[in-house]
Regions:
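Long, contiguous binding/interaction regions
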Residues: 29, 33-36, 41, 47-48, ...
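Terminal, regulation- and interaction-focused segments at domain boundaries
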Residues: 43-56, 61
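Intrinsically disordered, low-complexity repeat/linker tracts enriched for polar/charged residues
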Residues: 137, 142-145
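Long, low-complexity, intrinsically disordered segments
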Residues: 145-154
Length: 154
């Protein structure tokens, strides 16, 4: 990290790091670092369907410093424990953890443009799904409704 002047009160916030393996990201976050979790596409989410990401850490002050530097309000901080991956799976304890959800335009505050472009290329629109091939189901017996069907008879 770049040094700052001795009289300066501003220290640039840490940049969240992405990891190829989620377990490495969890370990980094549990040690107090900022982990940029992988993007996920959520069909049914709080802010509607789309790509979601998050910055995770066990250090709430470090996470808030990053958020404030991106004009994300402090109220965006959420509490969610982290798994202690250094323990056996059976009886694994949970460690204090925090995250800030990112969606829509906020994704560009943390994720590089190439990562966002690759994620959008992986998106599949409902119109491209083929009935009967299995890609129209997210679990057995559940079909995705045609978006033009809507509520009939209104």
């Amino acid at each position: 990290m770049a040094s700052t002047l001795a009289d300066s009160a501003f220290v640039p916030p840490e940049i969240p790091r992405a990891f190829a393996r989620r377990s490495d990201g969890f370990r980094h976050a549990a040690a107090g670092g900022l982990w940029l979790a992988p993007l996920v596409y959520l069909e049914h989410a709080r802010f509607g369907p789309g790509w979601y990401g998050k910055v995770v850490s066990s250090d709430p002050e470090r996470l808030l410093a990053w958020a404030v530097s991106k004009a994300i309000p402090r109220r965006a901080l959420e509490v969610k424990s982290l798994p202690d991956l250094d323990m056996p799976r059976a009886g694994r304890r949970r460690l204090p953890g925090y995250h800030i959800d990112l969606w829509g335009a906020r994704l560009a505050l943390a994720y590089d443009p190439e990562t966002l472009a690759r994620a959008r290329q992986r998106s599949v629109s409902l119109e491209r799904l083929q009935p009967g091939t299995g890609d129209d189901q997210d679990r057995a017996g559940r079909n995705i409704q045609d978006p033009s069907a809507g509520e009939r008879g209104r």
